């Protein structure tokens, strides 16, 4: 009988068993998603506790009981007011999660999601030009839906798109931080954030906004692991974990110091001295460079300093090279004293040169006097000829020509006189005027 009943109504028994199971789990007139946490099984309660501990932080908004249906809200951080950012702080250290970043907040808790998904963080595809983060961060935030559509669409041909901003490489060691921060600052400047980055003098053109602060904060922690940061950077972040601007300011200052060290080494290696400037000025210049290097924990020995100075000596100071060539114990003070001695000797010689030249010029203007006459005639030689004066050769030529001409005239006169006398004596002829013929 029982087997026949089971064979006749197999669905009824299976349906009653299914109904009994479902009646234990969820009431028939209740939404399955509306079950409270108290009615869930134990493994669901444990998962709920774990999720609540990981997702809920101090100062966050209340999460509804139906956590399967509603996603948790990010931490609400009030925007900073007037004043320095290190005084306000974007987040308190209590909000930092216990992870490798002891003093950094997770990027997912920042309220600027569209900056975290910047295309600059992705590897550039040569077949698809990614749009660049060009507009300033201080502008109004775009709609997430529009931004997703904008990233998904291929840019038009007529749209001018600059080259993609390459992100900085990840920091690999504490010693490379000074080099890494240069690439990071260049990355921020290429991202149109140059106005809030300190310049070489440590000055900032404009105060950064909350969104710009969040963007710098997220990019810094993304590419600089905390355990690889230098000690002085960790000390700043322990006071205020979001004070990246102070880190950048001190980094720029240290870069200027490093550049000054390089300039000092170049100046010390290219020293030149020929006596055109005073020896005291040269000594002060060299001593200042050496003292500045010493303040930066770079000691320059006297032997090295003397060798660099001797290499640049020229003129009357050049012979000091041979004098110091065989010396093993070189003293910088002794070298400066010898340079000063040579400079003083040359200075004295230069002062005596004008007086000697004056005596020589007076010797040229010689005064001639005749001892037999009472009236003294002073004749001054004039070495400058006027335009009207003629050279001696021309004068001699004129004199010779005039004397020759006078000699010819005298001979002609004498010949005429002799001939006339000869006629009158021999022939006794007298010259008479011609008579007219009739």
From Swiss-Prot:
Renumbered residue ranges of the record's region Disordered: 1-86, 366-397, 419-438
Keyword S-adenosyl-L-methionine: no
Compartments, as annotated in UniProt: Cytoplasm
CC per GO annotation: cytoplasm
Source organism, top-level taxon: Eukaryota
Cleavage, annotated site positions: 397-398
GO function terms (MF aspect): RNA binding
Polar residues: compositionally biased ranges: 1-11, 19-39, 49-60
Keyword Cytoplasm: yes
Biased composition (Low complexity): 369-381
Pfam families registered for this protein in UniProt: TYA
A biological process from GO: viral translational frameshifting
Keywords for the protein's UniProt record, in alphabetical order: Cytoplasm, RNA-binding, Transposable element
RNA-binding: annotated span: 295-397
Record's miscellaneous remark: Retrotransposons are mobile genetic entities that are able to replicate via an RNA intermediate and a reverse transcription step. In contrast to retroviruses, retrotransposons are non-infectious, lack an envelope and remain intracellular. Ty2 retrotransposons belong to the copia elements (pseudoviridae).
Subunit structure: Homotrimer.
Function, as annotated: Capsid protein (CA) is the structural component of the virus-like particle (VLP), forming the shell that encapsulates the retrotransposons dimeric RNA genome. The particles are assembled from trimer-clustered units and there are holes in the capsid shells that allow for the diffusion of macromolecules. CA also has nucleocapsid-like chaperone activity, promoting primer tRNA(i)-Met annealing to the multipartite primer-binding site (PBS), dimerization of Ty2 RNA and initiation of reverse transcription.
Domains: entry comment: The C-terminal RNA-binding region of CA is sufficient for all its nucleocapsid-like chaperone activities.
Protein name: Transposon Ty2-GR2 Gag polyprotein
Gene transcribed to yield this protein: TY2A-GR2
């Amino acid at each position: 009988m029982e087997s026949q009943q089971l064979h006749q109504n197999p669905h009824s028994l299976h349906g009653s068993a299914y109904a009994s199971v479902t009646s234990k789990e969820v009431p028939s007139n209740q939404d399955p998603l509306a079950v409270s946490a108290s009615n869930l099984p134990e493994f669901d309660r444990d998962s709920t506790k774990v999720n609540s501990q990981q997702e809920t932080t101090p100062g966050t908004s209340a999460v509804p009981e139906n956590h399967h249906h509603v996603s948790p809200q990010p931490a609400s951080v009030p925007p900073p007011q007037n004043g320095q950012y290190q005084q306000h702080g974007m987040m308190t250290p209590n909000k930092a999660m216990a992870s490798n970043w002891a003093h950094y907040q997770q990027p997912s808790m920042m309220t600027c999601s569209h900056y975290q998904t910047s295309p600059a963080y992705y590897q550039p595809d040569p077949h698809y030009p990614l749009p660049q983060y060009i507009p300033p961060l201080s502008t109004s935030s775009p709609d997430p839906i529009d931004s997703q559509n904008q990233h998904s669409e291929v840019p038009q041909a007529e749209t001018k798109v600059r080259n993609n901003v390459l992100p900085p490489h990840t920091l690999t060691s504490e010693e490379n931080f000074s080099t890494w921060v240069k690439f990071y600052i260049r990355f921020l400047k290429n991202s149109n954030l140059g106005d809030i980055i300190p310049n070489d003098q440590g000055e900032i053109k404009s105060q950064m906004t909350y969104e710009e602060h969040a963007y710098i904060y997220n990019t810094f922690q993304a590419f600089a692991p905390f355990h690889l940061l230098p000690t002085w950077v960790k000390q700043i972040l322990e006071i205020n974990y979001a004070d990246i601007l102070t880190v950048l300011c001190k980094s720029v200052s240290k870069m200027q110091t490093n550049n000054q060290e390089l300039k000092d080494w170049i100046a010390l290696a290219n020293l030149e001295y020929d006596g055109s400037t005073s020896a005291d000025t040269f000594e002060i210049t060299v001593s200042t460079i050496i003292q500045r290097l010493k303040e930066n924990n770079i000691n320059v020995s006297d032997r090295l300093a003397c060798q660099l100075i001797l290499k640049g000596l020229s003129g009357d100071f050049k012979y000091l090279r041979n004098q110091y060539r065989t010396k093993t114990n070189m003293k910088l003070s002794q070298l400066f004293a010898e340079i000063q001695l040579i400079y003083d000797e040359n200075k004295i010689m230069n002062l005596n040169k004008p007086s000697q030249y004056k005596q020589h010029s007076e010797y040229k203007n010689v005064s001639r006097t005749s001892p037999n006459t009472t009236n003294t005639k002073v004749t001054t030689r004039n070495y400058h000829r006027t335009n009207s004066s003629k050279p001696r050769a021309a004068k001699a030529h004129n004199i010779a020509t005039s004397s020759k001409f006078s000699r010819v005239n005298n001979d002609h006169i004498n010949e005429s006189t002799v001939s006339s006398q000869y006629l009158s004596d021999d022939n006794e002829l007298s010259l008479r005027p011609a008579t007219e013929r009739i």
